[in-house]
Amino acid sequence: MTTQQPVAVLGGGSFGTAIANLLAENGHQVLQWMRDPEQAQAIRVNRENPRYLKGIKVRPEVEPVTDITATLEACELIFVALPSSALRAVLSPHVERLNGKMLVSLTKGIEAQSFKLMSQILEEIVPQARIGVLSGPNLAREIAEHALTATVVASEDEALCQQVQAALHGRTFRVYASNDRFGVELGGALKNVYAIIAGMAVALDMGENTKSMLITRALAEMTRFAVSQGANPMTFLGLAGVGDLIVTCSSPKSRNYQVGFALGQGLTLEAAVTRLGEVAEGVNTLKVLKVKAQEVQVYMPLVAGLHAILFEGRTLSQVIEALMRAEPKTDVDFISITGFN
């Protein structure tokens, strides 16, 4: 990537827009591709993304575009902020244009049919591309408002990590590197499920003890699952694990938290998602995670409980009683204690 080349951001949502602005602040020309010509024109004219990031000025160095072919041909570094359901359809026709380029996934989701993470799908679509992920406790609005923020870029490709750090690292945004791409990405996807539970707990005024218990047991549960799939447990003690889990389970700005809060207020799942007006990846992740956990025989009582409420007709009180009456397990069972006194 030369200094003259623009950087691409694929996706017109809140996070894609926040990252596009960060890149622009760091001196890059940015091509932000989106499917909706009306949205692109609105941003072009008003310098604001009113649908997803109202009140935040989009910098003049960010050019909203709708020609994906020209965008991919012009850029070597491409940030992919597309919904998980759209990834294959958008990128599959452009394999030749993506060969050898750096593709960095910003999407925290899991494909329903295959249980593949977004970077794994990118790898499948474009085997010759250089793949990375960006994940961490990163609420889009706070990034856009310049709240002090840290994130993790993960890839086996050290040079890619360095390129992303150079592109994004700034006065309010700190970028750490990791070679555990799978663990970093899995943490970002799994925590969305627990944010729904946390939002429900707050809406029902369950108290601080309960919220703390839920977040801590969620960390144990998601790490237990991730380790069973080959992830490094230490990844989950960092920004992409416990860091992301805390912010997503604590903030009303989190989309999945908002869905959970609406459910706790008595709305149906359909009404909660409609009220949000954006994709809440946690709902889709819950479905596939429940099946996968059963398949690999990993104990995930919070996942099973939320699934029972949303899709099996169980009441919240029934699930809470079952969870509290279950046999207590070991507190921290996902990290080997070998070598410790």
Curated annotation (Swiss-Prot):
Keyword annotations: Cytoplasm, Lipid biosynthesis, Lipid metabolism, NAD, NADP, Nucleotide-binding, Oxidoreductase, Phospholipid biosynthesis, Phospholipid metabolism
Annotated localization: Cytoplasm
Binding positions for NADPH per the UniProt entry: 14-15, 35, 108, 140, 255, 279, 281
Any coiled-coil regions, as ranges: none
Catalytic machinery residues: 191 (proton acceptor)
PROSITE patterns noted in UniProt: NAD_G3PDH (PS00957)
EC number of this enzyme: 1.1.1.94
Catalytic reactions of this protein: sn-glycerol 3-phosphate + NAD(+) = dihydroxyacetone phosphate + NADH + H(+); sn-glycerol 3-phosphate + NADP(+) = dihydroxyacetone phosphate + NADPH + H(+)
Keyword presence, Lipid metabolism: yes
Family annotation (Pfam families): NAD_Gly3P_dh_C (PF07479), NAD_Gly3P_dh_N (PF01210)
GO biological processes: carbohydrate metabolic process; glycerol-3-phosphate biosynthetic process; glycerol-3-phosphate catabolic process; glycerophospholipid biosynthetic process
EC class: oxidoreductase
Pathway: Membrane lipid metabolism; glycerophospholipid metabolism
GO molecular function annotations of the record: glycerol-3-phosphate dehydrogenase [NAD(P)+] activity; NAD binding
Amino acids binding sn-glycerol 3-phosphate: 108, 136, 191, 244, 254-256
SUPFAM superfamilies xref list: 6-phosphogluconate dehydrogenase C-terminal domain-like (SSF48179), NAD(P)-binding Rossmann-fold domains (SSF51735)
Keyword Ribosomal protein part of the UniProt annotation: no
Disulfide bonding pattern of the chain: none
GO CC annotations on file: cytosol
Function of the molecule: Catalyzes the reduction of the glycolytic intermediate dihydroxyacetone phosphate (DHAP) to sn-glycerol 3-phosphate (G3P), the key precursor for phospholipid synthesis.
Stored NCBIfam families: PRK00094.1-2, PRK00094.1-4, PRK00094.2-4
Similarity comment: family membership: Belongs to the NAD-dependent glycerol-3-phosphate dehydrogenase family.
Protein name (record): Glycerol-3-phosphate dehydrogenase [NAD(P)+]
